[in-house]
Regions:
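Short glycine/acidic-enriched loop and turn motifs that connect beta-strands
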Residues: 16, 84-86, 197-198
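Short hydrophobic-aromatic micro-motifs
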Residues: 39-40, 134-139, 161-162, 190
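Cys-nucleophile CN-hydrolase/nitrilase-fold catalytic domain and related Cys-dependent amidase chemistry
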Residues: 25-99, 168-187
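CN hydrolase (nitrilase-like) catalytic-core segments centered on the catalytic cysteine
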Residues: 62-76, 144-227
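Short polar catalytic/cofactor-binding loops
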Residues: 12-18
C-alpha cells in the first residue's frame, strides 16, 4: 500500500579512499541521522571516486553496518559502488540496502571521462518501489542525457534519485539538471552530490545535495561541507 508521505534524504558523508568498512560506518551514521524512508548517497560513495577500486559484492560483510542502520530506522539506503556482474562486466552501480537485503538496483548507463576504460554501461533505465512510491534512478552523467531522462520518466516515476560527483564549478549545471528532470518527469528529484576531495582529480567537489519539487523548486538543500544532509517529506501528488 502506498504511503501518503515519503521522507527522503540526500546525504554527502565523509569518504575514505578505498576503505569500504570505514565508509559503510559513515553511511550507517548518516542513515541514522537522516531519519528518512529513503536515503540517497553520491556516486561511488562506498569507495570514493576511485576508478580502480575492487568491486563490492552484495554479500560483503562490511555492508552489515548499513543493513543494521536501515533495520533500526526502517530506511532504504541507495549507495554508490563498483559491482561485478555474473557476466564478468564491471559497472558503476547504485545498491539498494534495506533491513532485509542488499541488491544492485541500477547500473550507470552513460559513462564519462576515463570510466569506459574500466566500466561497462548498464542495460537501461530502472525503477525501484519503496512504500508504494516508484523511484527512477540515475548516476551522474545519466542526469544530463535526454534519452535517459525520457526513458526513466516513461516508467511512471514519482521520484528521480541520483548520486553525483561534480566540481564546485559544475554546481549551476547540477541544479539546472535537477530542475529540468523534475519538470519533465513531473516527479520529485533527490540529488546526492559528493562533498570533500576524492579520486579522479576531484580535489574539490560541489556537495550541495538537494531535493526538488515536480515544479523544479528546491525543497531542501545541504551546503558544500562534508556530512551535510538534505531532507524533505513529500506528499503524494495523486491525492491533489
Amino acid at each position: 500500500m502506498r504511503s501518503p508521505v515519503l521522507t527522503i534524504a540526500a546525504s554527502q558523508p565523509a569518504c575514505k579512499a578505498n576503505d569500504v568498512a570505514a565508509n559503510a560506518r559513515s553511511h550507517a551514521a548518516a542513515v541514522r541521522a537522516a531519519k528518512a524512508q529513503v536515503v540517497v548517497f553520491p556516486e561511488l560513495s562506498l569507495t570514493g571516486y576511485e576508478l580502480q577500486a575492487p568491486p563490492v559484492s552484495c554479500d560483503d560483510a562490511r555492508l552489515n553496518a548499513i543493513v543494521e542502520a536501515c533495520a533500526a530506522t526502517d530506511s532504504v539506503a541507495l549507495v554508490g559502488a563498483p559491482v561485478k556482474g555474473d557476466d564478468g562486466l564491471i559497472h558503476i552501480a547504485m545498491l539498494c540496502v534495506s533491513a532485509r537485503s542488499v541488491k544492485v538496483a541500477y547500473r550507470k548507463c552513460y559513462l564519462g571521462g576515463k570510466e569506459p576504460m574500466r566500466f561497462s554501461p548498464g542495460p537501461g533505465s530502472a525503477v525501484l518501489d519503496v512504500d508504494g512510491w516508484r523511484l527512477g534512478m540515475g548516476i551522474c552523467k545519466d542526469t544530463g542525457v535526454a534519452a535517459h531522462v525520457r526513458d526513466t520518466a516513461a516508467l511512471g516515476i514519482d521520484v528521480y534519485v541520483a548520486g553525483l560527483v561534480h566540481t564546485p564549478e559544475e554546481l549551476p549545471s547540477q541544479e539546472m539538471r535537477a530542475a529540468s528532470i523534475a519538470q519533465e518527469s513531473k516527479a520529485f528529484v533527490a540529488f546526492a552530490s559528493f562533498a570533500g576531495p576524492t579520486g579522479g582529480g576531484y580535489e574539490r567537489t560541489a556537495g550541495s545535495s538537494a531535493i526538488w519539487s515536480p515544479e523544479g523548486d528546491v525543497l531542501a538543500s545541504a551546503g558544500p561541507e562534508v556530512g551535510g544532509i538534505a531532507r524533505a517529506s513529500v506528499r503524494d501528488t495523486q491525492d491533489d
